[in-house]
Amino acid sequence: MNRHPASTLAEGRHRYTLRVYYEDTDAGGVVYHASYLRYAERARTEALRDLGIPHAALTAQYGLMFVVRRIKVDYLRPARLDESLTIVTEPLVVGGASLVLRQEVQGSAGACAVLEVQLACVQPGGDKPARLPPSYRATLAKMRDARVGCDAIVRHDAGVRRDTGIGAAP
């Protein structure tokens, strides 16, 4: 698996750690509000990759992709230049054509922001929802139910399948 070194998956939660760079901040050294959206996007991408269901495989094998349908952000406290942040991602709802994730950006003094993101599955260029492949839905549901880790997945990205009982073959 091509896992990011700052990425872990355990007990139904994915953790992705990054550092705040100057480019992420305003003139006062505080993380600019839109930077949290980028952080969450990176963390979601790495979570899917660590589950063995990366964006590229969903498109290549099924002709589908995720788009953000709705996002809600609660900003709780500022993060600052050079601070180490961990983004914790966990699925709340796994539907037939969408999923809802909770993402918490954690800093040295606690939670900085909490995001609730609804992703819709669509065909590229399409504006109508498409059903998630059953094995993807099953993998995400197992994560939601806190029963999946990096070693208990169905690989979709490299043509390798480890039979774990988490869904059908791709």
Give the positions of each predicted feature:
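Catalytic strand-loop segment that frames the active site of acyl-thioester-processing enzymes
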Residues: N2-D50
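Residue-level recognition of specific faces of alpha-helices
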Residues: Y36-Y39, V67, Q118, T139
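Helix-adjacent hinge/juxtasegments
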Residues: A60-P91
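Short, surface-exposed acidic-centric catalytic microdomains
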Residues: D50-A57
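HotDog/MaoC-like acyl-thioester-processing domains
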Residues: N2-T8, R13-Y16, R49, Y75, ...
